[in-house]
Design a protein with these regions (language model features):
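Phosphate- and other anionic-substrate recognition elements at nucleic-acid/protein interfaces
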Residues: 1-111
């Protein structure tokens, strides 16, 4: 089982992936908020043998920016947990201006 956390941004998202044992497999993969960006994320995941059957994704509902990545992944049958920003407010304060830290926090939350 794999656990992916995505920190959502207007133009760029940052992803962090943990293995079942909690070991980071990647911590700061940036990808653009485009179809090509989503495809680059899938390429990275497939290289590690992560697939819809063995991957859980968590992402924060940031404005409307999360909708495109959610739709992209949902259309490919990935299991996605949308996290309320109120729940993650403490992490934003712990990692101000640090999407890498927030992506890791979201990954640990869905694990």
């Amino acid at each position: 089982m794999f656990f992916l956390g995505i920190d959502i941004g207007k133009n760029t998202h940052v992803a962090s992936l943990l293995g079942e044992d909690g070991r980071p497999l990647f911590r700061a993969f940036s990808f653009s908020n485009t179809t090509d960006g989503g495809e680059s994320l899938l390429t990275k995941l497939e290289a590690l043998e992560a697939s819809p059957s063995n991957l859980v994704i968590g992402l924060e509902a940031t404005g409307h920016y999360w909708l495109s990545v959610y739709s992209f992944l949902h259309a490919r049958s990935y299991k996605i947990h949308v996290i309320n920003p109120i729940q993650t407010d403490g992490w934003r304060n712990k990692y101000p201006g640090n999407p890498i830290g927030r992506a890791g926090a979201y990954t640990r939350l869905v694990r």
